[in-house]
Amino acid sequence: MPFPLDHYIEASHVDYKERLEEKKPRSWLKSVSAFANTEGGHLIFGVKNEPREVVGLENPQAVISRLTELIKVRIDPTPRYRVREVEIEGKSCVDLEVQDGPAYPYYYAFDGSHTAYVR
């Protein structure tokens, strides 16, 4: 079933990412922390924001595996989330839905420091 991109305007509950930044995961993991610490939200991978353009992902299952791995290692405690492959304009993308959590604050943990983000 196609994903309704028109329903998701980038704002406080939605963030678009052209691709998974593995060398700079902080760029999207801080959004995971912020969504978990507030009202939840979606990170949609495979969509450029400015101008909005669906570019898709070459290997969405690998992206899903890496997202799951990095969230478990870098967000403390691990938030509630759902990650799934979605079709947008005929291209494979990934929707990471982060739910607000009962155990906040949720921290981005890296190199001995813990930082909580909010939106």
Can you describe what each PLM-predicted range is?
Residues 1-119:
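Conserved N-terminal catalytic/coupling substructures associated with nucleotide/phosphate chemistry
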